[in-house]
């Protein structure tokens, strides 16, 4: 079986690796000169199943309204001139009920926990090195109200069997010693000891090398134009004036997957949510975090690599704009210097932005389409690194006709089509017949 995978980010590369492990002939196509050049390039570095929480949650509509008028707010909305942006936001708001939150959180945790298990197995099998740390992650609360609100997530963690520790401010330094200097600013934290960290770009590029060793062909610098459909199947993919044919196809172009598949009549409910990061040279190990902390107020993560610190966060709904907003750099700098003063050479930091493919229910789109040989692996939002190995393994199983180890039917695009049948008129997820 020959499979063409479209995209060489962490999602496409893990998919290709698992397909090759299952005996498929695999070709990966990407416009970039090497793997992990776009959204996987400089993300926050967290592998955090326990923090797999839907953006669409009770209370978010009120918070979003407040953030619109707040300096250093974690969310910014800039009209991109399309009706789709507003339709997508409306669909997200429709998921901000307690019932939908519970359903979406369970699906996300299921995939994320499985993905972490797959990552650990892959690491044990291959010895892959990517500056990984298995010291857990710590969510920091600056106010008593945030600390109390964590009880809701704890109930879900209990139900899903996810270990955790709720720490008051005095105990924060027991897991993050450098916080001893700034714990007086904090109300407490929620620690998830099973979460991990690591450099996603380094992982992806080294996994691409391992996949190539299994026979995967990576064709970089490719002008991938379109898929060619014939009836209920895909017949090929047009690349730089030629058409390449395969038995199966996997679309993993991140935020660009929606536009790429639109000519086929598929409308993926994916929107590019812009995120920012700083990569800071380490100045003092004693002043730096030992793993990852997440500032709940600013929605900013601070992650320790070997000799670097990655600070990532923010969410900007502005279409496909990749401009660097200096105000967001100031926010990232403020958070890291406020919590970990003197930890790094902030003035020498690399400032970066990427587009995270987000769905209205925060759950990725993983699985089949109405085209018999076309599969999707996109829409992971801020959790692409966390969910990559599990998503890649699930898609590889589906493509090769094997049964996935976890329930996966409710991860597919069909969940949006099912919603359409329950309501009058077309909904996000599939175009109505013309």
Curated annotation (Swiss-Prot):
FAD binds at residues 3-17. It is an enzyme of class 1 (oxidoreductase). Coiled coil: none annotated. GO terms for biological process: D-alanine catabolic process. Disulfide bonds: none annotated. It catalyses: a D-alpha-amino acid + A + H2O = a 2-oxocarboxylate + AH2 + NH4(+). GO terms for molecular function: D-amino-acid dehydrogenase activity. Transmembrane segments: none annotated. Oxidative deamination of D-amino acids. This is D-amino acid dehydrogenase. The gene is dadA.
């Amino acid at each position: 079986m020959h499979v063409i995978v479209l995209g060489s980010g962490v999602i496409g590369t893990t998919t290709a690796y698992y397909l090759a492990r299952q005996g498929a002939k695999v070709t990966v196509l990407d416009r970039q000169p090497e793997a992990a050049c776009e959204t996987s390039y400089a993300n926050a570095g967290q592998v955090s199943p326990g923090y797999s929480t839907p953006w669409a949650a009770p209370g978010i509509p009120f918070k979003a309204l407040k953030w619109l008028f707040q300096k250093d707010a974690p969310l910014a909305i800039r009209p991109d001139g399309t009706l789709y942006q507003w339709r997508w936001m409306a669909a997200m708001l429709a998921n901000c009920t307690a019932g939908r939150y519970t359903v979406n959180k369970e699906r996300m945790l299921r995939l994320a926990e499985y993905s972490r298990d797959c990552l650990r197995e892959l690491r044990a099998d291959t010895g892959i090195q990517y500056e990984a740390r298995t010291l857990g992650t710590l969510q920091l609360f600056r106010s008593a109200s945030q600390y109390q609100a964590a009880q809701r997530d704890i109930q879900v963690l209990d139900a899903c069997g996810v270990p955790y520790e709720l720490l008051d401010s005095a105990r924060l330094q027991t897991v993050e010693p450098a916080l001893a200097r700034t714990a007086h600013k904090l109300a407490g934290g929620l620690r998830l000891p099973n979460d991990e960290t690591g450099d996603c770009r380094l992982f992806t590029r080294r996994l691409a090398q391992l996949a190539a060793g299994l026979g995967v062909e990576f064709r970089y610098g490719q002008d991938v134009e379109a898929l060619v459909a014939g009836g209920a199947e895909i017949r090929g993919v047009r690349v730089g004036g030629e058409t390449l044919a395969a038995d199966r196809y996997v679309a993993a172009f991140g935020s660009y997957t929606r536009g790429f598949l639109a000519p086929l009549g598929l409308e993926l409910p994916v929107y590019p949510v812009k995120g920012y990061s700083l990569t800071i040279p380490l100045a003092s190990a004693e002043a730096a975090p030992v793993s990852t902390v997440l500032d709940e107020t600013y929605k900013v993560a601070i992650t320790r690599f070997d000799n670097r610190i990655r600070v990532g966060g923010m969410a900007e709904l502005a279409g496909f704009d990749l401009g660097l907003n200096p105000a967001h750099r100031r926010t990232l700098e403020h958070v890291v210097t406020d919590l970990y003063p003197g930890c790094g050479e902030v003035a020498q930091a690399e400032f970066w932005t990427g587009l995270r493919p987000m769905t209205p229910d925060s759950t990725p789109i993983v699985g089949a389409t109405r085209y018999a040989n076309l599969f999707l692996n996109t829409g992971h939002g801020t959790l692409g690194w966390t969910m990559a190995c599990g998503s890649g393994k699930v898609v590889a199983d589906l493509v090769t006709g094997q049964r996935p180890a976890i329930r996966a039917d409710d991860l597919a695009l069909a969940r949006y089509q099912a919603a359409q049948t329950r309501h009058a008129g077309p909904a996000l997820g599939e175009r109505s017949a013309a």
